[in-house]
């Protein structure tokens, strides 16, 4: 007969649940767990190879942090016995062996600690894979990803050299990669049509200037004529009888080296009958020398800061004018060309006129283009045999070596001049290419470069001359990787495009933020003196209205 056994009921008046542990479960260890944990945590060998860190600990849990199931090695005191503690001399092999054993013990201890806190241990092969993945990821981001996006954010949109109006029509567009492929070899030897002006001789004492014997840059008040093509009386006279394309060396150098430019610039083109005239706008910034234009991080200060792009350009132009005259033997004997300076009036003092000579040269480009260019020399130099060499004098200026990956000229110019010129070529590639093209067009034997730095980084009004350097234009062109064939190819391409246009006025404009130049057709009266007078009158009327 079945017998009913009354169960033992535990009464817990002060709480909920049993108040004592049953006998069969008294010595059994227990560790809290979660029924929501994923299965497979024990045998997860793939966790070390996860590329996304979000899935590295997908089997981890907030439970299981206890040490109920952890194994701890306890020493058995029953086996304790006294031993001889006398120290014996150990061999080098034994010392190294103990050192490796201690390192292995520390590694095992760290591994046990990581297991205790559910940290994932990567095997040796997985560690190497992870390091290789991180290295490749950083390399990729440095070359293509993060760095490029950061540069795009840091670059501010640049302003155009002239405001493009709504009634201007785009006639042609040329991108720089296309222009860089141009080549033209059918260029005849230049012929001198007329030479004007007078040049002062170069003072060779400036070749001995070093950073230890620096020389202050003086402010020399002389008149520099920057007359555009159509205002030149000699070109007007020559245009009646010969030539069908006319320009100045500065304008042609801008076009021939345009693929290196970053800032915006513009050139006015006038098609009169079968003739082309390349001009610059009046009161434009065309003659200002840019500073660090092609650097990775060009100057971006705004407002009245002396390190803003425009103020730096004005400072560089000021330095270039003063150095080109200070390094000459001013007030002494001059080298006179057959004709006088066409821009100097009879009542003007010759000592107030800058040392400059104009050489009007003629090139034959193929069978249909007769190019006449006004080129310039800045000085003359006597050689060892008493011969005369014409030179172009230009100036590189240091404004702050901490910017644009610059090099401190006072420390490197004498010992590592190659590093200085390499940095300048990187930061001012377009400016150096323009100067080289001007020297090649003029036929100058040498290109003199002066190194001028600020007296103090924060003072843009005082400067010192730290040294000079001399180059032959052809050799310097190869050093700066300037292809003369490509330069003539770009010029021939621009001339052919303009020759296909109808008679009128056009504008060649470099896009301020893209590697593109465009040709715009301009309405009648654009950039004329009458239009400028009307704009000035409108500005004066607006100022009077504001005052009232």
UniProtKB/Swiss-Prot annotation:
It is found in: Cytoplasm. Pfam families: eIF-3_zeta (PF05091). It comes from Macaca fascicularis (Crab-eating macaque). Component of the eukaryotic translation initiation factor 3 (eIF-3) complex, which is composed of 13 subunits: EIF3A, EIF3B, EIF3C, EIF3D, EIF3E, EIF3F, EIF3G, EIF3H, EIF3I, EIF3J, EIF3K, EIF3L and EIF3M. The eIF-3 complex appears to include 3 stable modules: module A is composed of EIF3A, EIF3B, EIF3G and EIF3I; module B is composed of EIF3F, EIF3H, and EIF3M; and module C is composed of EIF3C, EIF3D, EIF3E, EIF3K and EIF3L. EIF3C of module C binds EIF3B of module A and EIF3H of module B, thereby linking the three modules. EIF3J is a labile subunit that binds to the eIF-3 complex via EIF3B. The RNA gate region regulates mRNA cap recognition to prevent promiscuous mRNA-binding before assembly of eif3d into the full eukaryotic translation initiation factor 3 (eIF-3) complex. GO terms for cellular component: eukaryotic 43S preinitiation complex; eukaryotic 48S preinitiation complex; eukaryotic translation initiation factor 3 complex. This is Eukaryotic translation initiation factor 3 subunit D. Disulfide bonds: none annotated. The keyword Cell inner membrane does not apply. The lineage of its organism: Eukaryota, Metazoa, Chordata, Craniata, Vertebrata. The gene is EIF3D.
């Amino acid at each position: 007969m079945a017998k009913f056994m009354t169960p033992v009921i535990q009464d817990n008046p002060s709480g909920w649940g049993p108040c004592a542990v049953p006998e069969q479960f008294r010595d059994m260890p227990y560790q809290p767990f979660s029924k929501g944990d994923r299965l497979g945590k024990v045998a997860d060998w793939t966790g070390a190879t996860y590329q996304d860190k979000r899935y590295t600990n997908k089997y981890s849990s907030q439970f299981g942090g206890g040490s109920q199931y952890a194994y701890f090695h306890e020493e058995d005191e029953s086996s304790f016995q006294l031993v001889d503690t006398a120290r014996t001399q150990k061999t080098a092999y034994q010392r190294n062996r103990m050192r490796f054993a201690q390192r292995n013990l520390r590694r095992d201890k760290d591994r046990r600690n990581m297991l205790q806190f559910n940290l994932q241990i990567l095997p040796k092969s997985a560690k190497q894979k992870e390091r290789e993945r991180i290295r490749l990821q950083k390399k990729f981001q440095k070359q293509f990803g993060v760095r490029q996006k950061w540069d795009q954010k840091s670059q501010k949109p640049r302003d155009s050299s002239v405001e493009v109006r709504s009634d201007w029509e785009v006639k042609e567009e040329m991108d720089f990669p296309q222009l860089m492929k141009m080549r033209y070899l059918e260029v005849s030897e230049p012929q001198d049509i007329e030479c004007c002006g007078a040049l002062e001789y170069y003072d060779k004492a400036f070749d001995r200037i070093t950073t230890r014997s620096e020389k202050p840059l003086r402010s020399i008040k002389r008149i520099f004529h920057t007359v555009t093509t159509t205002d030149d009386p000699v070109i007007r006279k020559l245009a009646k009888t010969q030539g069908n394309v006319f320009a100045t060396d500065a304008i042609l150098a801008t076009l021939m080296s345009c693929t290196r430019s970053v800032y915006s610039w513009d050139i006015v083109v006038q098609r009169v009958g079968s003739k082309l005239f390349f001009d610059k706008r009046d009161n434009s910034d065309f003659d200002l020398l840019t500073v660090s234009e092609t650097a990775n991080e060009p100057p971006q200060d705004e407002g009245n800061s002396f390190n803003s792009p425009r103020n730096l350009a004005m400072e560089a132009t000021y330095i270039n004018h003063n150095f080109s005259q200070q390094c000459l033997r001013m007030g002494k004997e001059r080298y006179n060309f057959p004709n006088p300076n066409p821009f100097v009036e009879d009542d003007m003092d010759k000592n107030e006129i800058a040392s400059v000579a104009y050489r009007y040269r003629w090139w034959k480009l193929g069978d249909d283009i007769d190019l006449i260019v006004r080129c310039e020399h800045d000085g003359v130099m006597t050689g060892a045999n008493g011969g005369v060499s014409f030179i172009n004098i230009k100036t590189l200026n240091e404004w702050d070596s901490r910017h644009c990956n610059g090099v401190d000229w006072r420390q490197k110019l004498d010992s590592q001049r190659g590093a200085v010129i390499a940095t300048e070529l990187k930061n001012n590639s377009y400016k150096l290419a323009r100067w080289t093209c001007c020297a090649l067009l003029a036929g100058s034997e040498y290109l003199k470069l002066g190194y001028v730095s600020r007296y103090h980084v924060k003072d843009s009004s005082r400067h010192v001359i730290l040294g000079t350097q001399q180059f032959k234009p052809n050799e310097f062109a190869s050093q700066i990787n300037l292809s003369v064939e490509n330069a003539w190819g770009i010029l021939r391409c621009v001339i052919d495009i303009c020759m296909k246009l109808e008679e009128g006025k056009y504008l060649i404009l470099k896009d301020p933020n893209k590697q593109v130049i465009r040709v715009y057709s301009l309405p009648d009266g654009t950039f004329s003196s009458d239009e400028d007078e009307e704009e000035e009158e409108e500005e004066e009327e607006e100022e009077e209205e504001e005052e009232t």
